[in-house]
Amino acid sequence: MVLLYILIMVALIPMYMTVVQDATFSHPPPGLLIPEAWSGSGSIRLWTDAQEIPVRCFWKLVYDPRIHPETAAIQQGDSIMYMYSGTRFLDYRTVLSALLLTFVFFWRMLSMFDRSRNRFQRACVSIPSALLEVCRQKAIKKTATLPFYGQALYFGIMCLYTAHIVLWDFLNSFAGTLWLITLNLANGTAQIINLRKERHRNRHDEESSWTFGQIVPIVLLVSPLVAAFEDLLSKRSRRALREGSVGNTSLNEVDLTPEPSLTEATTLSLHTRPLIYSVPTSITQSSIASQKSSGTPAQDLIRSSWPYAILFWELHVLLAFMVIWLPLAQSQLFIFRYAYWEAYYAFPAAVGTFWLTVVIAVPFSSIGRSSYPCPKPRRSGLNVA
């Protein structure tokens, strides 16, 4: 898996690195002919002042108009994609893709081992949940003296509590992993397609042709998605095989046992009947117990409410929108193809939509009706827990 992670990180370079094409153009290898429209000298001349590797920096594009004044007009239209810091432009697409891929890799890698999985769950899930539970209890106590302040505080805590549970349940689900991988794949594929639509005419024909080296990055990015589907199918097949083997073993034990007389057959049936039904019953009970989370009453209340279901499926819709929007926003269908922040406005829009749903749904749900502390239980008919 570590080798696969390294290969995917390498595959991200030609996908997200528009700085590679700009650096190659800004520092072309010796012997490259520059047309007069780009050279600014009035004629085609030979570029010989670059002796290093053109793509020496994968994260930043070194640009200084004083050193290369010819490229100032060319890169002026692309500078909006980078954050200008001194004489360096930082490509956030590379940073975003690398962070997303690294998070998904280490998150799923740590979940493979019991010790790391338990530590991760304790640090990111259990401890914040315990703190929110303590704050919830304190808000209930403050309601007796400060009703309005206590209810407002309780409302804010329950909003955070609900969002915390929904997000981590979504990330722990199989669909959450697939959506994160698909989001990275869609963004990277859009970058490859955009690079094929090269605006520099001297490289348009070469960049428009798909070769083995251009297809390999897509194959490497698709591999985690294929592995995730394969893992899902293998789990289902193993579960079906295990259930079938349990049933066949119990039936075979009953069929192969001799029944010499009626008394022995009755005794045999009394002994074999628990053997037949005990294993499937225990499996069913364990699966039901695992489905019912052994959390606090507040967590069980949140998971059984309708805002939890709405928010859970809303995350699916928002990530599906991001998967569709990012390739379209970076294509030639939009004017702001080279405006990075305009193309990525969907990220804060998705976050804002999620929190707006949380704020609207929580007070009108069973969470608000049954959990809001009230200083006068007889009047409201609510029991303070």
From Swiss-Prot:
Keywords: Glycoprotein, Membrane, Signal, Transmembrane, Transmembrane helix. GO terms for cellular component: membrane. It is a multi-pass membrane protein. It is found in: Membrane. The keyword Chloroplast does not apply. It comes from the Eukaryota. Induction: Expression is up-regulated during nitrogen starvation or at alkaline pH, conditions highly conducive to elsinochrome accumulation. The chain crosses the membrane at residues 94-114, 148-168, 209-229, 309-329, 344-364. Residues 1-22 form the signal peptide. The keyword Ligase does not apply. Glycans are attached at residues 187, 248. Part of the gene cluster that mediates the biosynthesis of elsinochromes, pigments consisting of at least four interconvertible tautomers (A, B, C and D) that have a core phenolic quinone to which various side chains are attached and which play an important role in fungal pathogenesis. The non-reducing polyketide synthase PKS1 was proposed to iteratively catalyze decarboxylation between acetyl-CoA and malonyl-CoA subunits for polyketide chain elongation. This is Elsinochromes biosynthesis cluster protein HP2. It comes from Elsinoe fawcettii (Citrus scab fungus). The lineage of its organism: Eukaryota, Fungi, Dikarya, Ascomycota, Pezizomycotina.
